Swiss-Prot record:
A biological process term (GO) from this entry: CTP biosynthetic process
Pfam families: NDK
Named cofactor requirement(s): Mg(2+)
Free-text function comment from the UniProt entry: Major role in the synthesis of nucleoside triphosphates other than ATP. The ATP gamma phosphate is transferred to the NDP beta phosphate via a ping-pong mechanism, using a phosphorylated active-site intermediate.
Protein name (database record): Nucleoside diphosphate kinase
Subcellular location: Cytoplasm
Oligomeric form and interacting partners: Homotetramer.
Family: Belongs to the NDK family.
Entry keywords, A to Z: ATP-binding, Cytoplasm, Kinase, Magnesium, Metal-binding, Nucleotide metabolism, Nucleotide-binding, Phosphoprotein, Transferase
Main subcellular location of this protein, as a coarse class: cytoplasm
Length: 144
C-alpha cells in the first residue's frame, strides 16, 4: 500500500456549522494525518483558478460564489491510500446519495453546499496541494 497525500477543503457551509473538529476527528480515525492546514477566505480569482477545470460547466459561477462566501479550512492529509480513503470518508458528491456516517451525509445540505472537497487522483492531489501550500508548509510524517 502506498503512502499518499491528498488535499482536503472544508467548505464555507461546514466551517459556518462549526464542525471542523468533528471532520478532523474522522480523518484521524481513518488513519490519515493532517500534515498541513490553514484557514483562509478565498478570493474570487483564487476560486476561479482553483476550479478552472469546471469553467465550462453550468454550475461554475455558483461554485465560485459559494466558495468565496466565507472562510474555508484547507489541509493536506497523508496516509496509506489517502486519496481513496478521504473520498470514502467524504461520501457521494450529492449528500442525498452519501452513505450514513460519511461527512456529506452528516454535515452537507445539498449538492452545492456539500461540506468538503477532496482530490480525485494522484496528479490532481499534487497540483491542488501546490496551489495552496509551499513545500516548506507541510511536514513529512513518515518515520515520526
Amino acid at each position: 500500500m502506498a503512502i499518499e497525500r491528498t488535499l482536503s477543503i472544508i467548505k464555507p457551509d461546514a466551517v459556518a456549522k462549526n464542525v471542523i473538529g468533528q471532520i478532523y476527528s474522522r480523518f484521524e480515525k481513518a488513519g490519515l494525518k493532517i500534515i498541513a492546514a490553514k484557514m483562509c477566505h478565498l478570493s474570487k480569482p483564487q476560486a476561479e483558478k482553483f476550479y478552472a477545470v469546471h469553467k465550462d460547466r453550468p454550475f461554475y459561477p455558483d461554485l465560485v460564489k459559494f466558495m468565496t462566501q466565507g472562510p474555508v479550512m484547507i489541509q493536506v492529509l497523508e496516509g496509506e491510500n489517502a486519496i481513496v480513503k478521504n473520498r470514502e470518508i467524504m461520501g457521494a458528491t450529492n449528500p442525498k446519495e452519501a452513505l450514513p456516517g460519511t461527512i456529506r451525509a452528516d454535515f452537507a445540505d445539498s449538492i452545492d453546499a456539500n461540506a468538503v472537497h477532496g482530490s480525485d487522483g494522484p496528479e490532481t492531489a499534487k497540483e491542488e496541494i501546490a496551489f495552496f501550500f509551499k513545500p516548506d508548509e507541510s511536514f513529512n510524517s513518515i518515520g515520526v
